[in-house]
Regions:
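Non-catalytic signal-transmission and effector/linker regions of two-component phosphorelay proteins
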Residues: 1-7, 20, 109-125
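Two-component/phosphorelay signaling modules centered on CheY-like receiver
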Residues: 13-31
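Acidic catalytic/metal-coordinating carboxylates
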Residues: 34-38, 61-65
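Active-site beta3 strand of CheY-like receiver
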Residues: 46-52
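Receiver (REC) domain active-site loop signature in two-component systems and cognate sites
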Residues: 57
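Alpha4 helix (beta4-alpha4-beta5 surface) of REC/receiver domains from two-component response regulators
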Residues: 64, 86-106, 111, 115
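Conserved sequence signature across two-component system core domains
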Residues: 9-10, 33, 51
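Active-site residues of response regulator receiver
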Residues: 54, 84
Length: 125
């Protein structure tokens, strides 16, 4: 049986790689990418159960990537979680907050991540 797939997108390579490694250790099949365009491609190619998108990324920010993922996947988009140090009322998140199913704050706390994973269909197998 295959493991649930998660895409982690953050322009901070260390942060993306660390989170993907943690998710792998937790039993998920996690892939790290480093900008919004890569996130859109990964979601299109890999059909993940969950995508965790940093809001402020180069080339295509997290909100624009979420919009494109939703448009391209036509109802089959993964659960989308924003990951940001911004407050919800801050730009650019406020204009795109409805694009995400949930929001995570930086620095990411393990209990928040565990809660998100428990609420998703992304279950380790």
């Amino acid at each position: 049986m295959s493991r649930s797939r998660i895409v982690v997108a953050d322009d901070n390579h260390d942060a993306a790689d660390s989170l993907a490694q943690l998710l792998d250790l937790m039993g998920y099949d996690a892939v790290a990418v480093y900008d919004g365009e890569q996130a859109v491609r990964a979601c299109h190619d890999l059909h993940p159960d969950l995508a965790i998108l940093d809001v402020q990324m180069p080339l295509l920010d997290g909100c624009a990537a979420a919009r494109q993922i939703r448009d391209e996947e036509d109802g089959r988009a993964p659960l989308l979680a924003s990951l940001t140090a911004l407050k919800l009322q801050d730009e650019p998140l406020s204009s795109g907050r409805d694009l995400f199913d949930t929001h995570l704050s930086k620095p990411l706390r393990i209990d928040e991540l565990s809660s998100l994973l428990a609420r998703t269909t992304a279950v380790p197998r």
